[in-house]
């Protein structure tokens, strides 16, 4: 039997609030090994919520609701569920006292409207809310239907899920075998190209392998259902090892690894330092490098040489080359990388110069054209040309440029290690 998530709130339908609750609960259900095939978002409307319940009860055995537990007239979840199952509500004096105590602790008197939060269907149990005033409930109105309700505030919902809902579900026999996943991360290769290399693994049933793509990055999820992490790793790790061998340098990390953190560890391990010279990214590369705590161990700093005069004055870029080839050129990227490496006395120097748009492009130098220079400790400089696409927006081109530059450094550090 499966679970279904029903998120209540007109603000979700209007896009005023991002529905992070559904994502969190979906991940949690997967961890518990509870099948989950449907999600529904319903506005604050009694009849539409009843229709959603009617559909859900026919195809799912655990109905998880978020939102609509507040004190205002449009908070209708509890009474609508009770009415659907033709059950009357009761006022729980203990819960009412707890709500009043929370207001008292804040030096406030409880508004009369909050008393509705102490209402619960006959036969249901409250899910305590340690931080907010809206408790949830656990209720089995029918033999094959279990209902759990949570407030829409994510922090409150998450704590209630962990402290009360998970123990309850486990006590009912759910979660004996959980789904364990490992995410392998790749850069410098597209989703389709990577999929072709590991196509034979997509037919596996234990573990399963599935690709996911995001901006400039591809992930492969390796998942299995097992009674313990140790048992899961015995199934996952051989497949992960095979994929890493196939991918080679395109593989950069797993699970919570980030590219800036991986590059930082490589620099720290090799006792080397880095500086950057940026034009079109405007400091974006330096920003992602310094997201990592302790990055001062290996990051010397950067020069944002947006103006050509700064390129000449601080990076020793040849003014004649700027005039002849333009700021967006391989020769200028080369000189920028060498210039910042020398100026800040670091082992490595990275440069980025390009056209992020939306204007400034031409037939020969379109928007999305970016040159990335990399100066090595030996004094060698390599420059790569990239065309990130005229149809991409400015922010995307800047982000891809910064991460591509960092990935170029990662590959060189691995080759030299």
UniProtKB/Swiss-Prot annotation:
Fetch the SUPFAM superfamilies from UniProt: CinA-like, Molybdenum cofactor biosynthesis proteins
Q: List all membrane-crossing ranges.
A: none
**Source domain of life:** Bacteria
HAMAP family according to UniProt:
CinA_B (MF_00226_B)
Spell out the family assignment given in the record's similarity comment.
Belongs to the CinA family.
NCBIfam families the record matches: cinA_nterm, PncC_domain, PRK00549.1
Annotated protein name in UniProt: CinA-like protein
Organism equals Microcystis aeruginosa (strain NIES-843 / IAM M-2473)
Source taxonomy: Bacteria, Bacillati, Cyanobacteriota, Cyanophyceae, Oscillatoriophycideae
């Amino acid at each position: 039997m499966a679970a279904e998530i029903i998120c209540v709130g007109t603000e979700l339908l209007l896009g005023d609030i991002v529905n992070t609750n559904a994502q969190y609960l979906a991940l949690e259900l997967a961890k518990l090994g509870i099948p989950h095939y449907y999600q529904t978002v319903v506005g604050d409307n009694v009849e539409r919520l009843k229709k959603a319940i009617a559909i859900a009860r026919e195809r799912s055995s655990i109905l998880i609701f978020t939102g609509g537990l507040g004190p205002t007239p449009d908070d209708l979840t509890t009474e609508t569920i009770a009415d659907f199952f033709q059950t009357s509500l009761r006022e729980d004096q203990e819960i009412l006292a707890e709500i009043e105590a929370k207001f008292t602790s804040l030096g406030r008197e409880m508004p009369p409207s909050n008393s509705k939060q102490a209402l619960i269907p006959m036969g249901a149990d409250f899910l305590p809310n340690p931080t907010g005033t809206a408790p949830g409930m656990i209720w089995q109105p029918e033999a094959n239907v279990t209902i759990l309700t949570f407030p829409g505030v994510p922090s409150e919902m998450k704590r209630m899920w962990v402290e009360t809902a998970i123990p309850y579900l486990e006590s009912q026999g759910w979660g004996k075998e959980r789904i364990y996943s490992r995410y392998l991360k790749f850069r410098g290769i597209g989703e389709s190209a990577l999929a072709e290399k590991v196509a034979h693994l997509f037919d596996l049933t234990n573990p399963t392998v599935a690709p996911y793509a995001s901006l400039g990055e591809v992930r492969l999820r390796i998942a299995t259902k097992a009674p313990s992490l140790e048992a899961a790793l015995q199934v996952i790790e051989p497949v992960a090892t095979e994929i890493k061998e196939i991918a080679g340098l395109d593989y950069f990390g797993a699970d919570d690894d980030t590219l800036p953190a991986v590059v930082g560890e490589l620099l720290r391990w090799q006792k080397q330092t880095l500086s950057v010279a940026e034009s079109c990214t405007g400091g974006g590369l330096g920003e992602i490098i310094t997201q990592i705590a302790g990055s001062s161990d290996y990051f010397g700093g950067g020069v944002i040489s947006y103006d050509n005069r700064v390129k000449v004055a601080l990076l020793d870029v040849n003014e004649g080359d700027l005039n002849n080839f333009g700021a967006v050129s391989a020769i200028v990227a080369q000189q920028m990388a060498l210039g910042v490496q020398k100026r800040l006395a670091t082992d490595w120097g990275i440069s980025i110069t390009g056209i992020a748009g939306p204007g400034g492009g031409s037939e020969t130098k379109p928007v999305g054209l970016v040159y990335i220079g990399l100066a090595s400790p030996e004094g060698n400089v390599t420059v790569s040309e990239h065309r990130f696409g005229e149809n991409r927006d400015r922010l995307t081109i800047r982000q891809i440029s910064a991460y591509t530059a960092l990935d170029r450094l990662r590959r060189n550090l691995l080759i030299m290690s």
